[in-house]
Amino acid sequence: MNETTHGTQPDRLTKIKTAEGEKEVDIYSPEGFAVVANLWTRSNWQNKLSYEVTWLGIPIIQLPEDILMVQELIYKNRPDVIVESGVAHGGALVLYASLMELLGRGRVIGVDIEIRKYNRLAIESHPASRRITLIEGSSTDASTLDAVRSRIQPNESVMVMLDSNHTRDHVRAELDRYAPLVGPGGYIVVFDEVMPMVADAPNGKPTWDADNPLSAVRDFLAKNPDFEVDASYERLATTYCHSGFLRRMATNS
């Protein structure tokens, strides 16, 4: 029998370093929970656990907690169209399309600068593919945006998921270009805002401290007061979408 697990319990106190020095935190306290969630998120990223996750057979590369929160958002918001930049293997597209299939409405537009042949084949042969349209091109190019707009009717509600190039400048450009598609009450979700948290990780980069999607979101919110962070979708604590669920408020609200 593992004595640590089934016999003597490990110490419930852990030490953390703060600006004021070292302090002990009870792991069962709210403060301790926040510390453990932060450590788990960072270690999870370094060990690439999100790469172990699939949705209906397709790799999705997202935290299970974020998948649950996105599911909840789609069910509550029920957009007519979801636009995603950053197709990768296509798992997220299949997630959105399968939820829309259950809801009996809606479709998904996936945008990527390069959609590899085997990924396209996996997506287009999937049972959820009838609700998916793929557009190959840079998400910030005018021609790509025109192709996206041409597939959206004027009266349709739109949700946007940004998960492509994660530099500050690119994400900011995406936010500026795709925000007009989202009406009052609609959402933009920005992924991979974990980057500044893992800038010091073995697989991270020091430049991520400033060059990351979270910085782009802060820049965008400073100039677009009609959008706000909906922190209710971060309540599971472990997330790659810190301040990433952006809700467009009603005009003059």
Identify the residue ranges that each predicted region occupies.
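Polar low-complexity intrinsically disordered regions
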Residues: M1-Q9, V217, T251-S253
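N-terminal auxiliary segments of SAM/dcSAM-dependent transferases
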Residues: N2-A37
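Membrane-proximal envelope and lipid/glycan-remodeling enzymes
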Residues: E22-D26, W45, E156-M159, H170
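Class I SAM-dependent transferase core
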Residues: A34-Q62
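S-adenosylmethionine/decaboxylated-SAM
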Residues: L56-I58, P64-S253
